[in-house]
Amino acid sequence: MDSNTITSFQVDCYLWHIRKLLSMRDMCDAPFDDRLRRDQKALKGRGSTLGLDLRVATMEGKKIVEDILKSETDENLKIAIASSPAPRYITDMSIEEISREWYMLMPRQKITGGLMVKMDQAIMDKRITLKANFSVLFDQLETLVSLRAFTDHGAIVAEISPIPSMPGHSTEDVKNAIGILIGGLEWNDNSIRASENIQRFAWGIRDENGGPPLPPKQKRYMARRVESEV
């Protein structure tokens, strides 16, 4: 096993512990808590994959961070902060919407690019809106936290979420996953609209009508992929 992989995991565990302490002291906001829960699942998945104990990894991570801080100067910290752009957190969904349990009558699942696409194929002839929570860097979607599809009545009928035990995903991975989800839902004559944030930061476009953020050619390609799988 690569030593850098182990070191990275140990440091991530310790930094998560620090963030958890902030949360316990009510010193953070809702997006912070949202990321904390997501990262906890990811760390458990990575720990299982690497065969490492989280508690031991956290202690080792503490030693690594303390050694780095001993040699870190305030001037170096200022330079690092000035040169590193900070990601923004975009929230289409409330905490209730992103954490609500939902069920599928005719479940369909597909893994693509470190993302899990789930949809209920029993849903037909509905108007569906896609909402997502994600981080943005350089005015482009960086990391997807969760994307869910809602009917006009607020029922959840589909979801895209990162797989904790797998490495990160790219913007293209998210686009492909959304394409698969849209194609699968449109196959059953549902009409899909995406939030303005999804259109803007995933595809860099604005559609005032809220239509699916896919060009017709790509939509047909994705629909054929879903059709062949169904």
Swiss-Prot record:
GO biological process terms on file: symbiont-mediated suppression of host cytoplasmic pattern recognition receptor signaling pathway via inhibition of RIG-I activity; symbiont-mediated suppression of host gene expression; symbiont-mediated suppression of host mRNA processing; symbiont-mediated suppression of host PKR/eIFalpha signaling; symbiont-mediated suppression of host type I interferon-mediated signaling pathway
Keyword entries, A-Z: Eukaryotic host gene expression shutoff by virus, Host cytoplasm, Host gene expression shutoff by virus, Host mRNA suppression by virus, Host nucleus, Host-virus interaction, Inhibition of host innate immune response by virus, Inhibition of host interferon signaling pathway by virus, Inhibition of host PKR by virus, Inhibition of host pre-mRNA processing by virus, Inhibition of host RIG-I by virus, Inhibition of host RLR pathway by virus, Interferon antiviral system evasion, RNA-binding, Ubl conjugation, Viral immunoevasion
Motif (Nuclear export signal): 137-146
Molecular function (Gene Ontology), one example: protein serine/threonine kinase inhibitor activity
Domain of life according to the entry: Viruses
Main location: host cell
One Gene Ontology CC term in the entry: host cell nucleus
TM segment ranges: none
Matching Pfam families: Flu_NS1 (PF00600)
Region (RNA-binding and homodimerization): 1-73
Subcellular location as annotated: Host nucleus; Host cytoplasm
Maturation and modification: Upon interferon induction, ISGylated via host HERC5; this results in the impairment of NS1 interaction with RNA targets due to its inability to form homodimers and to interact with host EIF2AK2/PKR.
InterPro entries referenced in this protein's UniProt entry, alphabetically: NS1 (IPR004208), NS1A (IPR000256), NS1A_effect_dom-like_sf (IPR038064), uS15_NS1_RNA-bd_sf (IPR009068)
Annotated stretches, region: PABPN1-binding: 223-230
SUPFAM superfamilies in alphabetical order: Ns1 effector domain-like (SSF143021), S15/NS1 RNA-binding domain (SSF47060)
Residue span of motif Nuclear localization signal: 34-38
Renumbered residue ranges of the record's region Disordered: 209-230
Function: Inhibits post-transcriptional processing of cellular pre-mRNA, by binding and inhibiting two cellular proteins that are required for the 3'-end processing of cellular pre-mRNAs: the 30 kDa cleavage and polyadenylation specificity factor/CPSF4 and the poly(A)-binding protein 2/PABPN1. In turn, unprocessed 3' end pre-mRNAs accumulate in the host nucleus and are no longer exported to the cytoplasm. Cellular protein synthesis is thereby shut off very early after virus infection.
Subunit-structure text: Homodimer. Interacts with host TRIM25 (via coiled coil); this interaction specifically inhibits TRIM25 multimerization and TRIM25-mediated RIGI CARD ubiquitination. Interacts with human EIF2AK2/PKR, CPSF4, IVNS1ABP and PABPN1.
Domain note: The dsRNA-binding region is required for suppression of RNA silencing.
Family, similarity comment: Belongs to the influenza A viruses NS1 family.
Protein name: Non-structural protein 1
Organism, scientific name: Influenza A virus (strain A/Pintail/Alberta/358/1979 H3N6)
